[in-house]
UniProtKB/Swiss-Prot annotation:
Residues modified as N-acetylalanine: A2
GO biological process, alphabetically ordered: limb development; negative regulation of fibroblast proliferation; regulation of transcription by RNA polymerase II
Compartment(s) of residence: Nucleus
Species: Bos taurus (Bovine)
Predominant localisation class: nucleus
Family listed: Belongs to the Mediator complex subunit 31 family.
Protein known as: Mediator of RNA polymerase II transcription subunit 31
Length: 131
């Protein structure tokens, strides 16, 4: 009985840890949040930097599939570099990253729509010639 209760407690704890780490990793996609962390000295704390290194397991497909903002993995990768962490103190750096993300999303959406339209046209042609 006690073992079952302990197991349930472990499962609940693991689930909570998973949710908290998922939420935190996704917050890393926000350049303004990264700037906030840098200005408050979190990136100078060796324990925090080690925690960021630990979080690299989110790059594994079994975990990455839960991410809503995949660009957070790129930011997590960049945060492994001290130079990048130091640059984030500068608000202009965060603003530049933010602008680059917006440009990427805009062009990605357009490219994706064009590719989808081309694929749909190709399928229509294949269906028409196959009949």
């Amino acid at each position: 009985m006690a073992a079952a209760v302990a197991m349930e407690t472990d499962d609940a704890g693991n689930r909570l840890r998973f949710q908290l780490e998922l939420e935190f990793v996704q917050c890393l996609a926000n350049p303004n949040y990264l700037n906030f962390l840098a200005q408050r000295g979190y990136f100078k704390d060796k324990a925090f930097v080690n925690y960021l290194k630990y979080l690299l397991y989110w790059k594994e497909p079994e975990y990455a599939k839960y991410l809503k903002y995949p660009q957070c993995l790129h930011m997590l990768e960049l945060l492994q570099y001290e130079h990048f962490r130091k640059e984030l103190v500068n608000a202009q750096c965060a603003k530049f990253i933010d602008e680059q993300q917006i440009l990427h999303w805009q062009h990605y959406s357009r490219k994706r729509m064009r590719l989808q339209q081309a694929l749909a046209e190709q399928q229509q042609q294949n269906n028409a010639s196959g009949k």
